[in-house]
Amino acid sequence: MFSPIGKVAQPYFCSFLLSTILGFVIAPRTIAALKNIQKGRNPVRSCFPAAHLAKKSGIPSMGGVIILLPCILSTAIFGDLHDRDIWVILTTMVAFAILGGVDDYLKFTRQNPQGISLEAKLFAQLLIASAALIFLSYTSDSFTSTHIFSKGLIDLGWAYMPFAYIVVVGSSNSVNLTDGLDGLATLPIITSTAILGIIGHLSLQFGAEPPGVVGANIPIFCSALVGSALSFLWFNAHPAQVFMGDLGSLSLGASLGLMSVMLKCEFIYAISGCIFVAEAISSMAQVAYCKLTKGRKIFLVAPIHHHFEKAGLKEATIVTRAWVIAMVSFVVSLAAIIYIYR
């Protein structure tokens, strides 16, 4: 059914290997530097469970640099920097990383878990997403189309642009919400990235949609991201030595959402990232229900992983079960890919 990968896989493997090695090399010194800079000043919201407050305060954030730097360097070495697609992804990722980094910095300098206001953060996210999406709308022949579990593209017309905003900005914030327990967000990031990389490779191999995506840059980027995320997971797994922070979660979520838009696989991405979707829905449902009922709640705490934590489940149990769900969703996503590309 699928043609042999052949020599095209060589840059994928090299990108993955270099990024993994670089991640392991820079992680210890990066963690030490972040500890020295932040000096244990990593505020945690008081509404979270008491055990969470006790264990997480003092662990340095902004560890997303351990993922981003090796990924960017490896992509620059093995990718084609003359291709506009990779620049859209890298520029968007860096812009969201700067936004998240400023948010993280304000949190530990002000000793306030709020950081940038929600309104200002959302405005900045929409601004960055606008630049990327408007650029893509002028450079892609099929920008307003997508796969809705069909073998062909379906043109959504004017409705696609707001849909794309929801995908990119929603993905960014969903990953950010998920990054609340040791390793919880990292493995779903890895599995979702792998799915997008596979779709990117198949688009290259078969000359399939979307016609605006050319070359192996997206799978090379995804290979690098999987490698650096795996090395980060080594230090982020329970008991975590570092958190990716908003710097990592906002930028990685935006990158995944943007790639799904470029590859026209937003719905497959939603399946592979179902953990992110569940976390976002739980938070939105909690806020909406609380406003409608004047204070009543659906969950003990939102997002939902903190609900389970406050209900008495151990952190390791919550994370392991989330990882199981992520792996199952990975397999289901593969099945969807096979259906579309067979």
Swiss-Prot record:
Presence of the UniProt keyword Transferase in the record: yes
Swiss-Prot/TrEMBL catalytic activity: UDP-N-acetyl-alpha-D-muramoyl-L-alanyl-gamma-D-glutamyl-meso-2,6-diaminopimeloyl-D-alanyl-D-alanine + di-trans,octa-cis-undecaprenyl phosphate = di-trans,octa-cis-undecaprenyl diphospho-N-acetyl-alpha-D-muramoyl-L-alanyl-D-glutamyl-meso-2,6-diaminopimeloyl-D-alanyl-D-alanine + UMP
Principal EC category: transferase
Entry-linked Pfam families: Glycos_transf_4 (PF00953), MraY_sig1 (PF10555)
Pathway(s): Cell wall biogenesis; peptidoglycan biosynthesis
Alphabetized PROSITE patterns for the sequence: MRAY_1 (PS01347), MRAY_2 (PS01348)
This enzyme's EC code(s): 2.7.8.13
CDD domains recorded: GT_MraY
GO cellular component: plasma membrane
Residues spanning the membrane: 8-28, 58-78, 86-106, 116-136, 152-172, 184-204, 213-233, 242-262, 267-287, 318-338
UniProt topology in membrane: Multi-pass membrane protein
One Gene Ontology biological process: cell wall organization
Family named by the database record: Belongs to the glycosyltransferase 4 family. MraY subfamily.
Job description of the protein: Catalyzes the initial step of the lipid cycle reactions in the biosynthesis of the cell wall peptidoglycan: transfers peptidoglycan precursor phospho-MurNAc-pentapeptide from UDP-MurNAc-pentapeptide onto the lipid carrier undecaprenyl phosphate, yielding undecaprenyl-pyrophosphoryl-MurNAc-pentapeptide, known as lipid I.
Protein name: Phospho-N-acetylmuramoyl-pentapeptide-transferase
Organism per entry: Anaplasma marginale (strain Florida)
